[in-house]
Amino acid sequence: MADQTSGQFKRNVAFKVRIGEIFLGKPFLENEKFLFLELGNRKIIRVNIIGNIVDKYDSQSEKRYFFLTLDDGSGQIKLKIFGDDVEKFSDIRQGQTVAVIGNLRHFNNEIYIS
């Protein structure tokens, strides 16, 4: 939903939400591709959340990736990090408090942040 009609890229708003609110919203998909999360009168694509890392999974395989579990007291959501971004986040540890701005995604009936 980023506006590219003027030739300039316009980033979507990163809404401040609680994790528990995300799971109350309704995901809209088109051909199994996530478009946005409807929460009240808002159409949410990007989120801004502060929480604690409660779990970390590092694949350590050829195609390295991380799964982090973020908890803000209202719920938990996975953060999935792939490709070149893996090295940027390799120092994150369980128990740390982090501010996350990322895009919501939907796969296999699961909403996560990337």
Where in this protein do the model-derived segments appear?
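OB-fold and OB-like single-stranded nucleic-acid-recognition modules
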Residues: 1-114
